[in-house]
Amino acid sequence: DNSRNGTTGADFGNGANDINSEDVESVTVLKGASATALYGSRASNGVVMITTKKAGVEKLSVTYDGSFTASQVLRVMRTQDIFGQGWGSWDRAENGSWGPRLDGTIHEWGSDKLETPMTKPFSYVKHNLRDFYQTGLEQNHTVSLRYGTEAVGIVATYGNLNSTGIMPNDADTYARNTFSLRGYAKVNKFNFDMSMNFVRKDIRRAESMYMELLQHAVDVDMSSMSDYN
């Protein structure tokens, strides 16, 4: 819910993302008067109600669920392979592909302040854009403990999610640790229900850099700049 943020232009995300999917028992959509009656005017457009799992009468059990996912860039823009580095004429800069025709001759490149100039063939580098990105990896682990009788019951769940995106050097990462505890107790004519949730997220966001990548000279291998000094 970002309604409190006014017109700041900031999106603080969706609280539903903080819920471990393994904890979800059901998702219910409330509409109209029923939603407003329960949650007030803020629910005039409806409510998405997420119910987490609750223990029943069952023996003590411990379960584990895990998944691993890999992601890659599907496709990138095709770049021209006729003209090389420069702006109308050849230039030592690393961006701009409006220079002379590529002819395979040896050219200097990089900063003109280098004591020892770097050289490379004035040739088109294949797969330059695609090779900039890395394979994104995500692993998700959940451990749950359940136990219940007619009188008491408990469900405890710990979840760990770690994701590294497709940007190099782990520039875009997401880590989330969740712990949830839900229990109940029946004492005489009284029923007690308790729930607790803890969430910690560490997020590193990176700019897409796609515009900068498109301006990169087609004859300069991006990998050669990884240790550039």
Annotated model-derived regions:
Residues L38, S144, R182:
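Short, surface-exposed charged micro-motifs
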Residues G9, N20-D23:
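A contiguous binding-surface segment within folded domains or other stable secondary-structure elements
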Residues D1-N2, K189:
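Residue-level detection of beta-strand-connecting loop/turn positions
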Residues D23-S26, A43-S71, A151-Y228:
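Transmembrane beta-barrel strand/turn architecture of Gram-negative outer membrane proteins
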Residues S3-A16, G46, K54-D170, S208-M209:
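Residues embedded in well-ordered regular secondary structure
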Residues V29-K31:
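Charged docking surfaces used in two-component/phosphorelay signaling
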